[in-house]
């Protein structure tokens, strides 16, 4: 069985989950803290429960969360597939060093999973 989980990709929902659930905050710091704490519960559970983690470093945002998740997964000795383009190779060399595989795109990561699960290169 394969089950995929991911961070909440609705940026507004991710940012506002804390105040929506726990109540408003006057200061942005505490608003962000509430949301981050709730999101971290979900992320930690997903990483702890997984057999293989895929961490994608994209172009749109700074990738602090992806790097943090990769470090957490490495600390838990999870098998990790990292996805990033060549522009990030130098900056991510330590992350790449702890990964089982480094892919340049999602198609390559999918082929790795297919091979792991089915033994197929097709």
Per-region residue spans from a language model:
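Conserved catalytic or regulatory cores that recognize and/or transform ribose-phosphate-containing ligands
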Residues: 1-122
